[in-house]
A protein has these predicted regions:
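A glycine- and charged-residue-rich anion-binding loop/surface
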Residues: 13, 31, 37-44, 62-63, ...
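Short Gly/Ser/Thr- and Asp/Glu-enriched loop/turn motifs at secondary-structure junctions
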Residues: 119, 414, 541-545
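Conserved hydrophobic residues forming the short capping helix/wall of the S-adenosyl-L-methionine
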Residues: 104, 400, 535
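Hard-cation-handling environments
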Residues: 197-327, 331-356, 360-516, 524, ...
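His/Asp/Glu-rich metal-coordinating catalytic cores
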Residues: 2-67, 72-284, 303-317, 336-340
Length: 552
């Protein structure tokens, strides 16, 4: 049997999101997490990004399962798209499993997938691997780290974590078990790097409840709170404070409604009698007696808060004096959309409270001192920083060395690298495909660089179409060409330019006729080249030019 453990990250290194790591030994392999990433602003029309799973498809008979650390989209968002191509069982904690089931139901995959529910402390076998779930703290309940026992030693994969000494529910991270594993001997540690640039400790989730209390007790108007739908700890805090001040709570936003339902069914949210109220009835109460909890903390265009801000919500209108609380920090790249929503709310007379001026949100990721504690407890032989942009991985690597890991045993890896570990060495030996796969609507991977280049071109300069009608008998023009533009100029205000473009097309056709050129591709090429040259010369713009020939 092979004596080398292979760890292959397909996503999550050098980036935020898209977390997917393969563990491989001999004939057995399994996945840890299967997340999506958010598209950059220049990925026009792309809804989300998932990892390239070519390597998994080439080794599908060796896959023993998928193990999920928690229910955030950057760790579960790609699951439906992977399961459409590969069949494998999923192992997760109860709340995480319930959230995954919601996603699979949307894709008609629920009844075709085996999901095994495990709790912290449970151990189970996947081929030659034994996996143990270890309770951690994070901004979503039921988060776990993994202790992965392999034939050559134990690997700890932290997932996203923080060390919260006063958690809202679920108890503290299981530091004793991590320390016990460290004393027994940890071969390698793969640890969350998201907050490595922040010194000190991450604030406790309990800090937020005092802020909510202050904002609720002095408000005589309606309160609207938006937060991450998956943050059931935060939802519980909002419900508790609303009950304290005798306000009814309504939930709006499909993802939040779904997660609230499953979290309540599983016992992760405790709702006092008479607090919740259907959104269809909440408008009948005085505004001073209501709280609306909604999606939209990232300014998402179809979210409940966005629709409220732009007067598109069917049940809620924003009135002057309404207090809107944004209890979330901006995911990088979402700042502009959030700012637009906040501006619109201010224009409607709402009082908007957000993270820049009030401590309404705390991170779910460990800061430097917590990362040091994880290293001190586990005492790994090898250390691989994960879950972060490249500078974060480098910073975390330095902390690893500071905490006593031999410099030669610290590896800053890249997506796709095959990391081979033995009892005596760790090195990146080769690589597998690990690029981005773009999801656009129902299409998976059908948007490539050429399509994105065209979309970028259209977005920047628009399109000019030249419709040319030629005779089937002699190949000569039957009518004047028609010029159609989109995103280039307003035609009614550029009639002279349209006339000049028709002239350019006619001259191009005449030139082709003189040269007895009948090949459509050549004619289109001539027309395109001449229009492009004329437009750049006269406007200094380079729209996409698309000649279309119709034969009659």
């Amino acid at each position: 049997m092979a004596s080398k453990l292979k760890i292959i990250p397909l996503g999550g290194l050098g980036e935020i999101g898209k977390n997917l790591t393969i563990y491989e030994y001999g004939k057995d392999m399994f996945l840890v997490d299967c997340g999506m990433g958010f598209p950059d602003q220049d990925l026009y029309g792309v809804d989300l990004v998932i990892p390239d799973i070519s390597y998994l498809k080439a080794n599908k008979n060796r896959i023993r399962g998928m193990v999920i650390t928690h229910g955030h989209e950057d760790h579960i968002g790609a699951i439906p798209y992977v399961l459409k191509q590969l069949d494998m069982p999923i192992y997760a904690t109860p709340l995480t499993a319930a959230i995954i089931e919601l996603r699979l139901e949307e894709h008609d995959l629920l009844y075709h997938t085996q999901i095994f529910t495990k709790k912290p402390g449970d151990k189970f076998k996947l081929g030659c691997f034994e996996i143990e779930f270890i309770h951690t703290n994070h901004s979503i309940a039921d988060s776990v780290a993994l202790a992965i026992k392999t034939p050559i030693g134990t690997v700890i994969h932290t997932g996203d974590f923080k060390i919260d000494l006063t958690p809202i529910q679920g108890g503290m991270i299981d530091l004793p078990r991590l320390g016990q594993l460290g004393n027994e001997g940890v071969l390698a540690l793969l640890s969350d790097s998201t907050n490595v640039e922040r010194p000190g400790y991450c604030a406790s989730e309990a800090r937020v409840i005092d802020c909510f209390d202050e904002l609720f007790k002095d408000c005589s108007k309606r309160i609207i709170v938006t937060t991450f739908a998956s943050n059931v700890h935060r939802l519980q805090q909002i419900i508790n404070v609303a009950a304290k001040y005798k306000r009814k709570v309504g939930i709006t936003g499909r993802s939040m409604e779904n997660i609230m339902r499953v979290a309540t069914e599983l016992g992760y949210v405790d709702i006092p009698d008479g607090v919740m109220m259907d959104m269809s009835q909440i408008g009948s109460l005085p505004r001073s007696k209501t709280v609306i909890v909604c999606t939209g903390s990232q300014g998402e265009p179809m979210s409940a808060l966005h629709r409220m801000a732009f007067s598109e919500h069917k049940q809620v209108t924003i009135d002057a004096g309404d207090r809107v609380i944004i209890s979330a920090s901006a995911i990088p790249g979402n700042e502009i959309t959030i700012s637009r929503v906040i501006d619109e709310l201010f224009q409607k007379g709402a009082e908007v409270i957000y993270d820049r001026n009030t401590p309404l949100h705390v991170s779910g990721h460990a800061c430097q001192e917590e990362l040091k504690m994880m290293l001190a407890l586990t005492k790994p032989l090898y250390f691989i920083p994960v879950h972060g942009e490249y500078r974060m991985l480098c910073k975390h690597a330095e902390i690893g060395k500071l905490m006593g890991v031999e410099p030669k045993n610290v590896l800053v890896a890249k997506n796709g690298e095959v990391i081979e570990i033995t009892k005596r060495s760790m090195r990146a030996t080769s690589s597998v495909p690990a690029g981005d796969v773009y999801i656009d609507g129902t299409g998976v991977g059908d948007v490539g660089s050429a399509v994105l280049r065209d979309r970028r071109h259209l977005a920047e300069d628009g399109i000019v179409m030249a419709i040319i009608t030629l005779s089937a008998e002699n190949g000569k023009p039957v009518t004047d060409p028609e010029i159609i533009t989109r995103g280039f100029v307003y035609v009614k205000e550029a009639e002279a330019l349209m006339g000049e473009l028709k002239r350019v097309v006619n001259e191009s056709l005449a030139s082709c006729e003189r040269q007895k050129q009948r090949d459509w591709a050549a004619i289109k090429g001539r027309v395109k080249s001449n229009i492009s040259g004329y437009l750049y010369k006269t406007t200094r713009r380079s729209p996409m030019v698309l000649p279309v020939i119709i034969e009659v």
